[in-house]
Amino acid sequence: MTSPAHINIPSSIFIGAGAIDQVGPEVKRFGVNRLLIVSDPFMAKTEHLEHILQALQAGGIESITYGDVTPDPTDGNVLEGLALLKEHRCDGVLAFGGGSSIDAGKGIAVMATNSGHLSDYMGYNLIPKKGIPLFAIPTTAGTGSEMTRVTVITDTSRHVKMMILDPHLVPAAAFVDYTLTFTMPKPLTAHVGVDTLTHGLEAYVSRKANAMTDVFAISCIHQVGQHLQRAWHHPDDAVAREGMMLAASHGGMAFANSSVCLVHGMSRPLGAMFHLPHGLSNAILLPAVTRYSVSSAQERYSTVAKTLGWAEVTETEQMACDKLVSGLEALNASVEIPRLRDCDISEENFMSALDKMAEDALASGSPQNNPRVPTLGDIKKLYLEAY
């Protein structure tokens, strides 16, 4: 028998082409009259957002836009958005953009009803009060943040990425419309695509995996195997874009209800120290961490390889695991994922940050969910391998 698992996902999920057309009625259903729109400088100026704003206005819903979210959202973003929300007396938040905008929106929504600083709630289930309604519209097929009870915000005073996990962070509604992803540039498609695979893989091999998250994780992995390369080579392929959008959402449902592991634990310090986008740092680390981990969960990792189509179902677990590691390296090369040394990180700066990054990674708790739990020295070696 297995232990009970607690699953958190949004109460309303709209999926498919035209899903964003349901935003107005859904916001109205929650009794929200004035929204704070949370986005980044690029997405805040797109025709897609203008279309949404016009629909909201036609439905009698007012809005004000905070469009300054940075690629890795900070506590400063949350404070700026919160100040605007209070100034205009908004009673709901609509996050429009990639995972950064959605994560920032989550922070703003819960801090609208809770006191103190966001850093007070770093960790698990520490937010006392439910936030104001949050509506999430992802525009990248990547983080799956629209489905999760997780936000990751950088504490700028400590140079630490805070992982905050709490049911109060789950959006009230998510609108997963793959037509928003057609204009994603190739590098972003690659970064968030391999990030999506990381979510599915880590959720599946996590020590906290359960029967429900296994279903979401395997679906995520299968969709990535079918569609990532096609989406990268043919950005206007609707089937590939839809498949990757579903993969991202399923990956989010999976990892938020099982947990991420060593890749994410090591990725956050990289982002905090060197301002690497979350998806890119995950993608860079995935092959090395998988090579390190496979011996401790061969059955699970071999299933991942077979689900991706990289190994035959008749092959041994060891053969499939070997093909998984080589396949991840080949995937990164094929979609032009760089090494850390190619990301404007000098060897001197990298070595000076190595101890702190390893310590922060281990302290995050995520490595303890990994099939093979690393030591501090192991983490340092893995950083060096990825460099």
Q: What does each model-found stretch correspond to?
A:
Residues 1-30:
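N-terminal amphipathic/basic leader segments beginning at the initiator methionine
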Residues 11, 113-209, 300-307:
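A glycine/threonine-rich phosphate-anchoring loop and its flanking beta-alpha core
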Residues 20-23, 45-48, 75-78, 100-106, ...:
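Short glycine/serine/threonine-rich phosphate/pyrophosphate-binding segments
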Residues 21-36, 54-59, 87, 334:
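Glycine-rich phosphate/diphosphate-binding loops that line cofactor/substrate pockets in enzymes
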Residues 44-117, 230-241:
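N-terminal small/polar loop signature for handling phosphorylated ligands or for N-terminal nucleophile
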Residues 203-330:
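Active-site segments that bind and position negatively charged phosphate/pyrophosphate groups
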Residues 287-387:
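Mobile late-domain/C-terminal helix-loop "cap" segments
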